[in-house]
């Protein structure tokens, strides 16, 4: 018996049968062991018996029973599973005879299945006879599966019914109602039909960005085939979507993948043009299976495509088409391109309206039309790195899922009451142990309170459950309508006019009437009373999801946020002292953006802050970030002194291809891509190389920039602040009592214009001059710094108060108009914080104490009170 004459699956079956015999402590490998393995592991054996209409479960029971009857030999030195039984030898010899009869090159699984029928006393044959199955019937089933193929390779079993194994029948899926409806895209579908109807080169390839609906076009074609809304040549055709993953998966040996693909192509060829093969992500076929000098899968397609034996529809993205298919001119020539553009916002709304019902049925919610319009427009405006309609469909789906989760989980109000009941029950159990009068009185009060809470919890629970059941009932009726409509479509396609008339004029209107009554009743109840559950998906839910994905607040302004925005200028005035004009201009820009009246094609605001060092330019940017986002993390700070050389400019948008760091992206572009709603602070811009400003031109004008990877980065939701010290010497010398004269402003602007190009300055919203700080401003800053120190000491519960004399002394001593507020910080650290720290460490100032800081003979004194 030559094992090389067996297919790999038969060889594996014998090896597994031996392992089974060893595990079961059987001395010999028998036919029963082989069939136990075949019935559990071989897809072909199960399929053959299924086609022959054998009761496989009954057969498996017989095999298991027979296995249990084989005697178990135990003891030391026993060799398990080392010999083949006489019956198994006979089976192998009979299988070889079957192989010769069928004119095959190798012994495969089907020969074993046929050979066992010659062993009349074998339990398997006895069971099959009991089920009235003859060898002839099983042989017919095998020939049906083989479809005229011979066993010419050691992987033969892998290649039977290849299309069923490695593909999905889209037309069958449409008939069973598994696919969503395809709305629009009529021009592209017509184009595909036109190409498919050609005599030669009748292979369209759909090219478009990811998410624009390439696969949906093929699904739309399948739906048209089912509706018979196609030319005569395409009627009754089948579209098989090839699953590349399952085609490649498990192909262990060289050539196995090609063999599977060849089997698929052979089946398509034998169908005489009845099967249209759809290969999604067709670029994966080009080069698949290619090893040194080996022929790849793409080359296997070429001859069949050229001869018109293969009707193929491909789909791939623009980048991958260029990268893989355009390089292979011979393959590209055999395909006809169909460009699939991104749909407009209006088209996307139509697509969403068509899918609305499917989402409502799946999630059991009610979607408002304004939610669909919001999904299309907001996704187009804020989610710039993806394409319509995919991103809009995802938004609607996630908003529906959010509402569904809220319906299914316990409402927060009920959850609170339930927790309160649990807390009181624990307290009650503890008080029952106490016997003193005070505890008994407390117990009595607690029991009354507990009874009230329990009653409230029960009321809320019953209300929640009744609302939930109402929503479920509406969902069930919607599902029923969907099922009836699908039946109607099927009846019309099959020309079953009686059934179609009964459904159209009888069943469907009756169920629709029931749904209308339920929805009306539900709406009336909602209007009359406060509902615990919300089942409506509105534009607010969509805006919330956009905010969650991008970090950009697009929801309608709530009361708390209105207050915060209106008071933004006042809050910034407290943080940045003495720069009223700058604060007002920045807060106005944020206000315009949040009210939705800013130019949607430009950043929220772009400013140049000019002024001497230490007057609050960077501090204002930090304060704005803190007030807009409650943290300074949303501020992207880039020190322009790092971009002084020409070659360092590329670091902003990423290194060019071929250079180190190309994959990492740019420091500015990556930061904004991850955080599209943020403040971009470009510190000390006069230190940067002039080429940096060329990059910033389109950012300031169009709110967008292309990084080194070719991605479009959106700056439309950023505040761009640039700081500079240009003209600070003039501001220091000629500012009178904190006011900047028009002449001084004009002189500073002239210096600025000599430093920067006019096209750069012209694109900035505002150039703001920061005034040098006066002594009065410095006193205000002392207050602020003392407050910050107080916050740092709050952890140790130490409170400090500082006398007016001490504050005035600090302001006078530390005031230097040239250096602004920074010397003030240094002075407080040296003369207040350091002595204070020494007192705390020495134990003179303990936690929970108050410290009064005063001035005596130009020295600071610390008076501690408990």
Curated annotation (Swiss-Prot):
Chain segments carrying region Repeat 2? 84-148
Residue span, Clp R domain? 3-148
Q: How does it assemble?
A: Homohexamer. The oligomerization is ATP-dependent.
Q: What is the lineage of its organism?
A: Bacteria, Bacillati, Bacillota, Bacilli, Bacillales
Set out the biological process GO terms recorded for this chain's protein. Answer: cellular response to heat; protein refolding
Q: Does the keyword Hydrolase apply?
A: no
Per UniProt, where does ATP 1 bind? 208-215
A GO CC term? Answer: cytoplasm
Protein's name according to its UniProt entry: Chaperone protein ClpB
NBD1, as annotated region: 161-342
